[in-house]
């Protein structure tokens, strides 16, 4: 009994996926800006490509981004108060200028509390910019990826020889 192992190089696919990943990051950033999700710019500035890797017979494209991206994407259900320090930082960065009510102007800490209370009571609406970016980029890049796979397979199949 003899075993034949076929190995395939996917250089065209690697290039196509790199283009896909860079297009995704650019599109995601522009959608966040479009939807006014740039308070401090921390989320947008945190988005970086970690590249394409092959792990356990799968191709994985990885990006790095601020951990709170999921609240921007999926929103937040009503219930608990968000972390007060995060809301206070957001109030300071945005900047939100409190309006006086009955002649009393709230401090930034009081304003952060009021915002936190509203989030706890009503939640935060989902933004869906991540999902929208994936859909847009896939529709633009799908043909490129399919062509890259075809080119890679054609070139590899033509060099396979059994002796």
Task: Label each region the model flagged.
Residues 42-163:
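Charged, low-complexity interaction tracts
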């Amino acid at each position: 009994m003899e075993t034949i192992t076929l190995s395939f190089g996917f250089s065209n696919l690697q290039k196509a996926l790199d283009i896909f990943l860079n297009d995704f990051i650019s599109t995601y950033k522009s959608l966040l800006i479009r939807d006014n999700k740039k308070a401090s710019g921390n989320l947008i500035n945190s988005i970086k490509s970690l590249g394409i890797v092959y792990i356990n017979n799968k191709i994985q494209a990885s990006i790095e981004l601020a951990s709170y991206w999921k609240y921007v994407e999926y929103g937040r259900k009503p219930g608990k108060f968000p972390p007060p320090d995060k809301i206070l930082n957001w109030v300071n960065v945005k900047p939100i200028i409190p309006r006086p009510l009955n002649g009393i102007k709230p401090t930034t800490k009081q304003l952060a509390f009021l915002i936190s209370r509203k989030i706890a009571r009503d939640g935060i609406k989902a933004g869906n910019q991540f999902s929208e970016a994936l859909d847009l980029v896939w529709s633009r890049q799908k043909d490129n990826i399919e062509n890259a796979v075809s080119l890679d397979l054609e070139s590899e199949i033509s060099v396979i020889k059994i002796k």
